[in-house]
Design a protein with these regions (language model features):
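Structural signal for interior beta-strand "rungs" in well-ordered beta-sheet cores
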Residues: 4-139
Length: 139
């Protein structure tokens, strides 16, 4: 097993990339990121700092995980966006970090988020959830 990183992808040397991960064209993976075994990032995915992605996830084109929370109370504290194992994010999905020290935004195991879903700060999506296109979950 090996890691496959497209030559146009920008992947931080500080990111923790497990075996059998595929990172597609024009993806960006920042410093404080861990990606679990067997996960695949399609083209143009952006994984920001403070993100943990489990095993066997699939992130489709133009998804962004770990964006800063849209919360006036957020002051830059350490917070997280977490995708557990076997999560699918279809095209244009956004998952923001939490607001509050050591707080988490979490997508639980086996969930499937369809095109254009937005998951705001501090949201927890339960296991095996299917969320339809263009849904916004407020923080």
């Amino acid at each position: 097993m090996t890691v496959h990183i497209h030559p146009t992808a920008l992947v931080s040397k500080k990111a923790q990339i497990s075996e059998d991960v595929t990172i597609g064209p024009y993806c960006i993976v920042e410093d404080d990121v861990a990606i679990g075994e067997g996960t695949k990032l399609e083209a143009f995915v952006h994984v920001r700092d403070c993100v943990r992605i489990g095993k066997n996830c699939r992130l489709f084109e133009h998804s962004v995980v770990g964006g800063l929370p849209q919360d006036f109370d957020f002051k830059g504290e350490n917070s997280w966006a977490v995708l557990e194992d076997c999560v699918t994010l279809r095209e244009n999905v956004t998952v923001h970090r939490a607001s509050g020290e050591d707080k988490k935004t979490v997508i639980r195991k086996g969930s499937f988020l369809m095109e254009g879903v937005h998951v705001a700060h501090n949201v927890v999506v339960g296991p095996n959830c299917v969320i339809a296109n263009k849904v916004g979950l407020a923080g």
